[in-house]
Amino acid sequence: MQFPLASAHEDSPPAGLKLRDSCNRCAVSKIKCSKEKPACARCAKQDKVCEYSATKRAGRKRGSRRHNNPVPSPTTQDLPTAAPSTCPTFLEDPETIPLSPRPPFESYPDLFPGIFSIGDDPLIATPITLDTFSFPFDSFSASPISLPTLDVSDGDHLPDAVPLNHLNHPGDRTDVARATALLASDHASASSMDPAAGPQRPPDEPSSGPICGFIRALGLLNGLSSPAWPTSHHPGLDPRPSSRSIMAENEQTVRAISEMLHCQCFDDGYLLAILSMLILKVLSSYATLLRQTPGPDGDGVSWDNSTPPPGEQGAGVDGEDHCRTIAQQILGQLHRVQRLVSILSQRFNIPGGRARTPDSTAGPDLLSSIETLFPVPGSMLEQMEGLLRKRLRTLSAEIVDILR
């Protein structure tokens, strides 16, 4: 392909042609050309003819843009015909677009006063209050909003407003804590006094395991009624439990202790000591109930609301029969308590129950055990076992004397 050449001796290139920046000899040799016309430095030094070829893309002709481009027309005249009238709100004239009804700007003459003034700025010079803004803030809430820090005078018109410092009063926190404690105690006493209810235990917790055993034993010890009852009684203040409720509560406690002792995981000496105290409390409850029941001589205090007071029944046959009935019921429960004492004695003799001297040749796992490092003293368990058997013999002898 031949390109039109322009030498140094020729005139300026014809209109519409553009010459290359590099001459032909420099372009073929791929050497940077000095781009000097009519002859570059390399061609002038070698005394060669310097020729510049025309570029492959000729320049645009002058005046072509003016003839090719159409005359622009206003876009506002073509929009209604070019696009369908699906959204007339955006295509119509802004003056014809319907606006939502709003209050005119003149209805808020005091909104941000002096904000466009140059001389002074009242928003900075004076503090901002609710009087400065004439906007109806109360329409956003169901009840009026009181801001005492902004306007103290408006607080007198709100009789139902509660001061914030009233919530931090120490007496209120004490009342809330007392009410919570009373509700918890009422629930515990109602569940313990119900004969139809089973042994007290958490509903979702398993009935086995040392930790669960401790929790269950402590719950039974806390929920068991106190065996001692004051002689002065006010019927309107503290109603006494009946003998039936006390017998049912003790029976449930004995059944729960039996379930825990029959589990092989309850070999912990501390847990056995707690169960021993539970049995002692049950025996004390039986003894107190037996001694406060009116006997043939009219002594004692009536626990059961169905029996007449001691002053009215005296040494009648009804009082003697009631005392014998209570004694027979307690005697029917003592054989279960005696069985628990026998099981406890066997558990006291196992390695986990009694204290023993740590062996120096034992492994690290045995020495790290709490029962090995800090065991329950054997003398304490022996005293507990002797006390249980003594209380059981004493109570049995009293019942036999009543039934003779």
Swiss-Prot record:
<keyword id="KW-0539">Nucleus</keyword>
<dbReference type="InterPro" id="IPR036864">
    <property type="entry name" value="Zn2-C6_fun-type_DNA-bd_sf"/>
</dbReference>
<dbReference type="GO" id="GO:0008270">
    <property type="term" value="F:zinc ion binding"/>
</dbReference>
<dbReference type="Pfam" id="PF08493">
    <property type="entry name" value="AflR"/>
</dbReference>
<dbReference type="InterPro" id="IPR013700">
    <property type="entry name" value="AflR"/>
</dbReference>
<dbReference type="GO" id="GO:0045122">
    <property type="term" value="P:aflatoxin biosynthetic process"/>
</dbReference>
<feature type="region of interest" description="Disordered">
    <location>
        <begin position="54"/>
        <end position="83"/>
    </location>
</feature>
<dbReference type="InterPro" id="IPR001138">
    <property type="entry name" value="Zn2Cys6_DnaBD"/>
</dbReference>
<dbReference type="Pfam" id="PF00172">
    <property type="entry name" value="Zn_clus"/>
</dbReference>
<feature type="DNA-binding region" description="Zn(2)-C6 fungal-type">
    <location>
        <begin position="23"/>
        <end position="50"/>
    </location>
</feature>
<comment type="function">
    <text>Transcription factor that regulates the expression of the gene cluster that mediates the biosynthesis of agnestins, dihydroxy-xanthone metabolites.</text>
</comment>
<dbReference type="GO" id="GO:0005634">
    <property type="term" value="C:nucleus"/>
</dbReference>
<keyword id="KW-0805">Transcription regulation</keyword>
<keyword id="KW-0804">Transcription</keyword>
<feature type="region of interest" description="Disordered">
    <location>
        <begin position="294"/>
        <end position="318"/>
    </location>
</feature>
<keyword id="KW-0862">Zinc</keyword>
<dbReference type="GO" id="GO:0000981">
    <property type="term" value="F:DNA-binding transcription factor activity, RNA polymerase II-specific"/>
</dbReference>
<feature type="compositionally biased region" description="Basic residues">
    <location>
        <begin position="57"/>
        <end position="68"/>
    </location>
</feature>
<keyword id="KW-0238">DNA-binding</keyword>
<feature type="region of interest" description="Disordered">
    <location>
        <begin position="188"/>
        <end position="209"/>
    </location>
</feature>
<dbReference type="GO" id="GO:0003677">
    <property type="term" value="F:DNA binding"/>
</dbReference>
<dbReference type="InterPro" id="IPR050675">
    <property type="entry name" value="OAF3"/>
</dbReference>
<feature type="compositionally biased region" description="Low complexity">
    <location>
        <begin position="188"/>
        <end position="197"/>
    </location>
</feature>
<feature type="compositionally biased region" description="Polar residues">
    <location>
        <begin position="74"/>
        <end position="83"/>
    </location>
</feature>
<protein>
    <recommendedName>
        <fullName>Agnestins biosynthesis cluster transcription factor AgnL10</fullName>
    </recommendedName>
</protein>
<keyword id="KW-0479">Metal-binding</keyword>
